[in-house]
């Protein structure tokens, strides 16, 4: 459908089938319209990177629509916060010339604490397993959200996400298999999730125009999921190592500043810190060499990252190199787990010593639970 206006605007609607069924769904709070078959493929990047690549601002490009299964839905619920409802009521009173009562402190406190409502779209595979959740801001009328055919990435949970850099990729999971999928819609208000639309089926199909297609799509996905589980473990290890460094720093500060603590334990802390640094070098490489541009072997995280870089935009068989990188990273990480377990036990031993000496709080210790009124 092509539309043009006298204001020089020009619109092209690639799929307006939802509008044909809109009238019968106006009375419902929410509806997910029937979806046409979604074609799964990897977007081409002829300029080497996303968009205009390195061509400069003089090279004009326009963004393509997002790649994925397009979910068109109708939402007819206001989902206003208490503050929004109060202000709306106050405007009516002002318009009538009536007095506006100032809200109570409890009302204001409740408004300050109230989270804005949101929608959760859940994607299920044909067996009913949840494979992805997408959070969306509620908006009245006909809207669209796109599932990028990706499963949930197994990297660390983050409160905020940022746009990938020029040479980076957005955090993503492996590409799902073709087949039947389902999507449901929940609204969440004040922490209470309410089902608005139950599982709605849709079909996804691979475009098979590949030079070197994988013999088994299932085996390819199994390898990618295996790699993603390794990423899950290595990412978690990185966070634990960061916490261990913080714990050791505070333990050392306590020994140096608090009375009646054995200062000879500083040497013990330094030994554990060196142990932590050695583990970090295995995980992420040697920063002393990196700062001086000196060559070094690939770290565990680097090997995992290379496999993901090679395989996440690829539908061919894993290469011998990718299999070798996974095997090497897995074997090395098994040793790291053993070392980190020993390190954690040693740090807990020092923290127990601080507990016995009634030292004030340091990260990793629940000192507040030991207090009682005197």
List the model feature ranges, each with a label.
Residues 18-46, 194-232:
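Low-complexity, Pro/Ser/Thr- and charge-rich linker/hinge segments at domain boundaries
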Residues 187, 200-202, 233-374:
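Mature extracytoplasmic or organellar-lumen-exposed domains after removal of signal/transit peptides
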Residues 121, 163, 178-188:
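Short, aromatic- and glycine-rich surface loops/edge beta-strands on solvent-exposed regions
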Residues 9, 153-157, 186-198:
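Short acidic/polar inter-strand loop motif in beta-rich domains
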Residues 45-118, 144-146, 220-231:
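Contiguous beta-strand segments within globular domains
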Residues 1-59, 66-67, 76-78:
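Beta-propeller blade termini and top-face loops
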Residues 130-177:
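Glycine-centered tight-turn motifs at strand-turn-strand junctions
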């Amino acid at each position: 459908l092509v539309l043009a206006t006298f204001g020089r605007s020009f619109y092209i609607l690639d799929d307006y089938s939802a509008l044909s069924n809109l009238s019968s769904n106006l009375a419902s709070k929410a509806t997910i319209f029937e979806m046409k078959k979604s074609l799964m493929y990897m977007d081409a990047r002829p300029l080497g990177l996303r968009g205009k690549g390195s061509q400069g601002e003089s090279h004009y490009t326009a963004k393509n629509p997002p790649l994925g299964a397009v979910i068109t839905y109708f939402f007819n619920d206001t989902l206003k916060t208490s503050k929004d409802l109060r202000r709306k009521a106050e405007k009516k009173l002002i318009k009538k010339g009536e007095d506006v009562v100032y809200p109570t402190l409890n009302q204001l406190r409740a408004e300050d604490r109230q989270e804005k409502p949101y929608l959760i779209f859940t994607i299920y595979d044909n067996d009913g397993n949840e494979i992805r959740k997408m959070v969306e801001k509620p908006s009245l009328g006909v809207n669209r959200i796109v599932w990028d055919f990706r499963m949930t990435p197994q990297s660390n949970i983050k409160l905020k996400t940022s746009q990938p850099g020029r040479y980076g990729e957005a955090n993503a999971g492996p590409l799902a298999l073709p087949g039947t999928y389902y999507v449901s819609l929940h609204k969440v208000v004040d922490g209470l999730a309410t089902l608005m639309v139950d599982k709605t089926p849709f079909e996804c199909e691979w475009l098979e125009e590949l030079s070197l297609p994988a013999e088994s799509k299932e085996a390819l996905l199994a390898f990618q999921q295996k790699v993603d589980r390794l990423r899950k473990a290595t990412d978690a290890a990185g966070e634990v190592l960061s916490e261990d460094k913080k714990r050791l720093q505070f333990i050392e500060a306590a020994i140096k500043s608090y009375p009646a603590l054995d200062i000879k334990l500083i040497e013990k802390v330094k030994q554990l810190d060196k142990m932590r640094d050695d583990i970090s070098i295995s995980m992420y490489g040697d920063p002393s060499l990196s700062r001086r541009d000196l060559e070094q072997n690939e770290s565990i995280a680097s090997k995992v990252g290379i496999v993901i870089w090679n395989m996440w935009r690829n539908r061919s068989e894993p290469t011998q190199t990718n299999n070798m990188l996974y095997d090497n990273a897995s074997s090395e990480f098994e040793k790291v787990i053993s070392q980190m377990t020993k390190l954690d036990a040693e740090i807990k031993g020092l923290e127990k010593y601080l507990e016995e000496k009634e030292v004030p709080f340091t990260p990793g210790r629940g000192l507040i639970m030991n207090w009682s009124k005197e």
